[in-house]
Amino acid sequence: PVPINKTQRSFYGASYLFDQIGKLTGVEADLKACFPDTYKKILSLAYYLILEENNSLSRFSHWQRLHIHPHGKDIPSQRSSELFQSIEEKERVSFFEKQGKRRIEKEYWAFDITTISSYSEVLKQVKNGKNKENDHLPQINLALLFGEESGLPFYYRKLPGNISDVKTVKQLMHEFDVMGYRKVNVILDRG
């Protein structure tokens, strides 16, 4: 008999579910193609942010000791900041293209713009603009494109708060052209 040196209890259910979703949707494969050296860290941080939505990334060290996750090791808060900063626009667009191609034939794309009010005086994109709530705070606009059936987002863009929805849609159509999408079905709301 071999003596037991260490015992450990780890949570795996949610990670297993996310692993399967990542495989079925192509998210894991597309992340691996676009971020070959860091995709496991990205997945681990995504799992954490979904499961611990109210906790800051500084708590990842504690969480990762109790949960099985793709990276399998700690990602200190400073390293996660560096990881997010290292993501280049070219890589991000490549990921969006890959995800969009998986959805283009199968479903309509839904597009929505939301405003996020802010008191920040240092963020360049925080500007005075119009919003549905009619609050007169500076804001940033977030444009999101997602599969209508799957509900999976595969494109986002942060925009200055003073950019109108019409200009945003024109920019989106230009970006579709750049990404090689010639014929797409997009659902928009009247907002």
Language model: regions and residue ranges:
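Dynamic "connector" segments at or just before major functional cores
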Residues: 1-125, 143-162, 170
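Short, basic/hydrophobic alpha-helical segments
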Residues: 98, 166-184
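Non-catalytic terminal/interface segments that mediate subunit docking, oligomerization
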Residues: 128-133
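Short, flexible loop/turn motifs enriched in small residues
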Residues: 134-140, 149
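Short secondary-structure boundary/capping elements
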Residues: 136-137, 164-168
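Acidic, metal-coordinating catalytic cores used for nucleic-acid/nucleotide bond scission
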Residues: 187-191
